[in-house]
Amino acid sequence: MINYAQKIKEYRERKFLTQEEFAKLLGVSTPCVTRWENGKYEPTMQVKKKLYQLFVEAGMQLN
């Protein structure tokens, strides 16, 4: 199972993206990204699919 909170932060750091920039990339609000990174909420299935694709393209290990 993917730890989205950890992986989102890892991806942003690898790509030198702010939460705001990452939110724009996904078409969501900045507070949404903050909540995901804090583990307060999980992304929707549609967003998880986008995240998975970004993580794979970045060569990130997902397990």
Show the residue positions of the predicted features.
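Short alpha-helical DNA-recognition segment
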Residues: 16-34
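A short, Lys/Arg-rich alpha-helix, primarily the initiator
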Residues: 1-14, 52
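The DNA-recognition helices of helix-turn-helix-type DNA-binding domains
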Residues: 29, 40, 54, 58
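Residue-level detection of the helix-turn-helix DNA-binding "recognition helix"
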Residues: 13, 27, 38-40
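DNA major-groove recognition helix of helix-turn-helix/homeodomain DNA-binding modules
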Residues: 46-63
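Key DNA-contacting residues within the recognition helix of helix-turn-helix
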Residues: 9, 32-35, 44, 52
